[in-house]
Amino acid sequence: FISAIASFLGKFL
């Protein structure tokens, strides 16, 4: 899993 996507999901959630 890409860290960039993980951060995006973290902000979205």
Swiss-Prot record:
Where in or outside the cell it occurs: the entry states:
Secreted
Q: In which tissues is it expressed?
A: Expressed by the skin glands.
Secreted listed as a keyword:
yes
| Keywords, ordered alphabetically | Amphibian defense peptide, Antibiotic, Antimicrobial, Secreted
Main localization category: secreted
The free-text function statement in the UniProt record for this protein reads: Antibacterial activity against Gram-positive bacterium S.aureus (MIC=130 uM). Shows no detectable hemolytic activity towards human erythrocytes.
A GO BP annotation:
defense response to bacterium
Name a single GO cellular component: extracellular region
Keyword Secreted recorded: yes
The UniProt entry's sequence similarity note says: Belongs to the frog skin active peptide (FSAP) family. Temporin subfamily.
State the name under which the record lists this protein: Ranatuerin-8
